[in-house]
């Protein structure tokens, strides 16, 4: 390769020459894809929580000690939906997949937003070590099981007044103020032991590593 080649040129050539590629991906890749956790996107969905509780980004809100489970799940249902069930605003993951098409590849990621799967990467070549926004687990694990949450999260959002579009967009009818709590009957409980459930995210030693995690 010519000495004056750019880093992008060298990367392109390295990818072309490689028989196999290992991809390591963290939060920066999803940020590049438009999953901003602060600023306008945060204000669009969480301005009411910001005003009441004083945190200024989604990540900080995820650790806030909400006074009730009803409020906690109102917050988390919005958080989960826009970062897991809505498509990324920019096609960064699709572009990455095109770069490695036809090659052997393996992905190791700490991201929990399911973007690799939504971009049609082979799940068998993917290890997402920190969990998935789309899964729930027992808060005091009585078993190593996780449970898909799309249906219950949708119900939580609709109970707050949101309308979910065919493209998974969230909107509120004119004159409606979103509620900041869900009905108590929508709080998820473990089907095995009855304890409250939580997200399947690695934040402490209660993280459940289910069968899919170990494959």
Feature locations, PLM:
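Conserved catalytic alpha/beta core of Sir2/sirtuin-type deacylases, generalized to analogous enzyme cores
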Residues: 1-215
């Amino acid at each position: 390769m010519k000495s004056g080649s750019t880093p992008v040129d060298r990367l392109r050539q390295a990818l072309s020459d490689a028989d196999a590629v290992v991809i390591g991906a963290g939060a920066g890749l999803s940020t590049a894809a438009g999953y901003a956790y602060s600023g306008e996107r945060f204000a669009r969905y969480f301005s009411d929580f910001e005003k009441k509780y004083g945190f200024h980004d989604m990540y900080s809100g995820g650790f806030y000690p909400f006074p009730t489970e009803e409020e906690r799940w109102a917050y988390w249902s919005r958080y989960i939906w826009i970062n897991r069930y809505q498509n990324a605003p920019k096609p960064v993951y699709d572009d990455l997949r095109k770069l490695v098409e036809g090659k052997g590849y393996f992905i190791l990621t700490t991201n929990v937003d399911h973007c690799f799967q939504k971009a049609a990467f082979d799940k068998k070549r993917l290890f997402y070590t920190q969990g998935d926004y789309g899964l729930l687990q027992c808060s005091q694990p009585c078993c190593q099981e996780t449970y898909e949450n799309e249906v219950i999260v949708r119900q939580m959002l609709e109970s707050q007044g949101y309308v979910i579009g065919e493209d998974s967009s969230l909107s509120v009818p004119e004159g409606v103020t979103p509620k900041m709590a869900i009905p108590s009957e929508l709080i998820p409980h473990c089907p095995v032991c009855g304890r409250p459930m939580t997200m399947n995210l690695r934040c402490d030693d209660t993280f459940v590593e289910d069968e899919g995690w170990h494959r």
